[in-house]
A protein has these predicted regions:
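Catalytic histidine-centered segment of alpha/beta-hydrolase-like enzymes
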Residues: 265-274
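Short beta-to-alpha linker loops that shape the active-site pocket of alpha/beta-hydrolase fold enzymes
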Residues: 65-70, 134, 263-266
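Alpha/beta-hydrolase fold catalytic core
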Residues: 1-34, 56-59, 275, 281-285
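Conserved HGGG/HGGXW glycine-rich cap/lid loop of the alpha/beta-hydrolase fold
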Residues: 23-71
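Conserved serine/cysteine hydrolase catalytic core
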Residues: 191-249
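Conserved hydrolase catalytic core segment
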Residues: 100-139
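Conserved alpha/beta-hydrolase catalytic His-Asp/Glu region
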Residues: 156-210
């Protein structure tokens, strides 16, 4: 099943823009919704394989290209690339589409967006899945992400572009070539000179890299303390961003938090196979 591609119009304090989203399944025939949110430098096509599985389980699956990524608009004012602005866009998407029985699955930044929604008093989410992200982000992991988020390389051919994205993404896990091909095909676009470039605005990382330059962990415990819905943390075994100590503290604060570790991955596991789908399905019920 191919995704349907649509968009909604969004705005923040500074400007209006278009946010593209992909959908799988028929809303009228689906009693539950899974909203999938990608990582900082990624886009909604990361969820193609997860979507195929959960449509068969009766879900409507929605995966946006968060503004500045994929086929969504880029912002003129980079200050608009902010977690709470992203959360407002997702809340608008949920409202415009009249989505019901919503669960959110978010990788890295996408998980932070899910947390930002879940801590709100009028939270519309039933369950939350955090893929290698939590209430405290380790400085070493932040530096690693910042080291490539500010770069915008160009490549003469797809093969070189694919090699580049693989070299950055080895922590995703030991992925088969067809998955690497899928990741690469959806990570690049041809620019006006005919060269391959990443499908994201290089300016989107400015706020993030400023925070990462402060030589300390980013702590979000005040927000986590307000999250009350059942939550699953998927932890990359070798993650440099999410520590086991952080996960343990999260569980003490919020006892409805479950944890599953994915072996031989770092930040962050790329979710696509039967094992991953079973982990998610078992939690969603």
């Amino acid at each position: 099943m191919f995704a349907e591609v649509n968009y909604i119009n969004c705005k923040n304090a500074n400007e209006e823009y278009r946010m593209v989203y992909y959908s799988w399944g028929v809303q009228e025939k689906s009693s539950k919704t899974l909203v999938c949110l990608h990582g900082l430098n990624r886009n909604g096509r990361d969820w193609d394989y997860i979507a195929q599985h959960f449509v068969k389980q009766g879900y409507l699956v929605i995966a946006p290209d968060i503004v500045g990524r994929g086929n969504s608009d880029y912002l003129i004012n980079a200050n608009g690339y902010d977690t709470f602005n992203y959360a407002a866009d997702i809340l608008k998407l949920i409202g415009v589409l009249s989505l019901e029985n919503v669960c959110v699955l978010g990788t890295s930044m996408g998980g932070l967006v899910g947390m930002a929604i879940a801590y709100l008093p009028q939270n519309p989410i039933k369950k939350l899945i955090l893929n290698d992200i939590g209430a405290e982000l380790e400085y070493d992991g932040l530096v690693g992400i910042a080291s490539y988020s500010n770069s915008h390389p160009e490549f003469n051919n797809f093969s070189d572009a694919k090699d580049y994205i693989i070299s950055l993404s080895l922590d995703f896990g030991d992925l088969p070539d067809y998955i690497w091909e899928h990741i690469a095909r959806n990570s690049f676009q041809k620019n006006l000179t005919g060269r391959y470039e990443l499908k994201r605005d290089v300016n989107l990382s400015k706020t993030f890299t400023n925070e990462a330059s402060e030589n300390k962990n980013i702590e979000l415990w005040n927000y986590w303390g307000e999250v009350t819905i059942p939550t699953l943390v998927i932890h990359g075994e070798n993650s440099t961003l999410l520590s086991k100590a952080t996960i343990s503290k999260m569980q003490k604060i919020h006892p409805l938090t479950q944890v599953v570790e994915i072996k031989n991955t770092g930040h962050a596991p790329f979710l696509y196979n039967d094992e991953h789908c079973d982990i998610i399905s078992n939690f969603l019920g």
